[in-house]
Amino acid sequence: MTVHALLLRREPSVAGMLAAAAASSACFGAAVGSYTGRFQILYDAVKMPVYLLGTLAISFAAMHVFAARDLRAGETFGAALETVGLTAVVMGALSPLVWLFSASMPVSQQGYRILILLLTGSVAAAGIAGVARLHSRLRSIRLTAAWVLIYQFTGAQMGWLLKPWVSHTARDDRFLPLRQNLEGNFYESVITTILGLFS
């Protein structure tokens, strides 16, 4: 019922939206993990809900600062959770497609690159659906843009801390090498990569 309510823009319960977001994103994570298989399926199924909902939890206070003039805290949380919930549901709907490619793709550098492109496209499509719903709720381009920037800024670092998502080899199925992930951050990595292109 919650998924149906999300799709039809009805008012689902907070518990229902949390459950739908967790279940849908877990399905997507499991599909991603099936590229390497084995424990990576379970790892990614656990990490994907932590990523989406954890990013929301960390971002919420900053989001409400921008929305406090127009929305109460409960309304801010409801709009943000609905956005994340719909994004997760779309990701869940794309899980069979992602699983088909993940399970049949050879574990190689070429297969890895193709899968990363597929995952990027899938997450982008889900994100567009979520942002469209967010804008229809907020009815403010500036507030929508601010929320998206806050969530993406936080989410990029969350994704870095929770990596690996797609393992390079069948032997690389670690759950969370946190000590290694704490060395540097997403933005430092991007800058280093860009500078490396010109050195």
Could you say what each language-model-derived stretch is?
Residues 30-41:
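Short, hydrophobic transmembrane alpha-helix segments
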Residues 8-19, 41-44, 141-153:
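Alpha-helical transmembrane segments and their helix-start/interface "positive-inside/aromatic belt" motifs
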Residues 95-144:
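A contiguous pocket-lining binding segment that forms or flanks enzyme active sites
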Residues 1-18, 23, 178-199:
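N-terminal juxtamembrane cytosolic/stromal segments of multi-pass membrane proteins
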Residues 39-114:
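Alpha-helical transmembrane segments with an aromatic anchor "belt"
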Residues 137-199:
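C-terminal membrane-adjacent module
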Residues 34, 65-67, 135:
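Structural signal for the C-terminal ends of transmembrane alpha-helices
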Residues 18-30, 50-58, 85-98, 119-129, ...:
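Hydrophobic alpha-helical transmembrane segments of multi-pass integral membrane proteins
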